[in-house]
From Swiss-Prot:
Pfam families: PRC, RimM. InterPro entries: PRC-brl_dom, PRC_barrel-like_sf, RimM, RimM_N, RimM_N_sf, Transl_B-barrel_sf. GO terms for cellular component: cytoplasm; ribosome. This is Ribosome maturation factor RimM. GO terms for biological process: ribosomal small subunit biogenesis; rRNA processing. An accessory protein needed during the final step in the assembly of 30S ribosomal subunit, possibly for assembly of the head region. Essential for efficient processing of 16S rRNA. May be needed both before and after RbfA during the maturation of 16S rRNA. It has affinity for free ribosomal 30S subunits but not for 70S ribosomes. Binds ribosomal protein uS19. PANTHER family: RIBOSOME MATURATION FACTOR RIMM. The PRC barrel domain binds ribosomal protein uS19. Keywords: Chaperone, Cytoplasm, Ribosome biogenesis, rRNA processing.
């Protein structure tokens, strides 16, 4: 899959809201309202057209085209919202998108490749990076500057907590 057609998740429909087909969206963008600046798609690349939205506490409450009942809104619960990777704004050299770290090499302080990033999770308390080591062992680490002191587009350097 080329980077032009690669989908990046930037939000999720978390629940129905009210009785008239509105949904609550959890945005992964910063600020959260930036999600409204994109043409959103589901995993099949179907367009999810938002025709009105308001920010309410930590949620974005939206009306989605052709969704007019709570039952229809309930069926969208847990639908991830995507954009194409090329739609993301260009970042300065010292910044990166967390989603772009998936699959890159992990090196130790000596520069040896010891594994790769297998997964990135966020449980609302910060990002967690799952590293799969060359021997197949998987370990999850909090995504902090102490544990990952160097990050490039090709690799990250890890200092596991037992060495800090």
């Amino acid at each position: 899959m080329s980077s032009e057609s690669k989908l990046i998740p930037i939000g999720i429909i978390s629940s129905p809201y009210g009785i008239r087909g509105q949904v609550a969206i959890k945005s992964f963008t910063d600020p959260a309202s930036n999600i409204l600046n994109y043409e959103l798609k589901d995993y099949r690349k179907n367009i999810i057209k938002i025709h009105s939205a308001k920010i309410l506490s930590k949620k974005i409450i939206c009306n989605i085209d052709q969704i007019v009942t709570r039952t229809a809104a309930e069926q969208l619960t847990r639908t991830k919202l995507y954009i194409y990777k090329h739609e993301l704004p260009q970042l300065p050299d010292s910044e990166y998108y967390v989603a772009n770290l998936n699959g890159i090499k992990v090196k130790n302080l000596e520069g040896e490749i010891i594994g790769k990033i297998n997964n990135i999770c966020n449980y609302n308390a910060g990002d967690i990076i799952e590293v799969v080591y060359n021997d197949g062992k998987k370990i999850m680490y909090p995504f902090t500057n102490e544990i990952f002191p160097q990050i490039t587009e090709d690799f990250v350097v890890i200092v596991p907590p037992e060495f800090i």
